[in-house]
């Protein structure tokens, strides 16, 4: 469990910065999502994709910033919870990228 307030703030800031990059990334990368992955709902697909991508990057950032070993226990559900706290911003960023 992440108990250090400065680490938690740093993770929130990192996730916020990462979310701000998403619209440009979508415009440059995901040209025909429905054709490539044959998904029904593009917004839902990209939401799941970015939650996973941000979760992985945040875990890497956390391990790097705290100099923790990869063998140490880090609760990925806690990281996902931090991401979900910003779900509205994430959904808005994806919608902006899809316009």
Predicted ranges, named:
Residues 36-39:
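Amphipathic alpha-helical segments that form the core helices of the histone-fold
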Residues 41-81:
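Amphipathic protein-protein interaction modules
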Residues 17, 56, 60, 89-92:
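A generic structural signal for well-ordered alpha-helical segments enriched in polar/charged residues
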Residues 1-34:
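Short terminal alpha-helical segments
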Residues 69-99:
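Amphipathic alpha-helical binding modules
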Residues 22-26, 30, 34, 58-69, ...:
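Long, hydrophobic, amphipathic alpha-helical segments used as structural scaffolds
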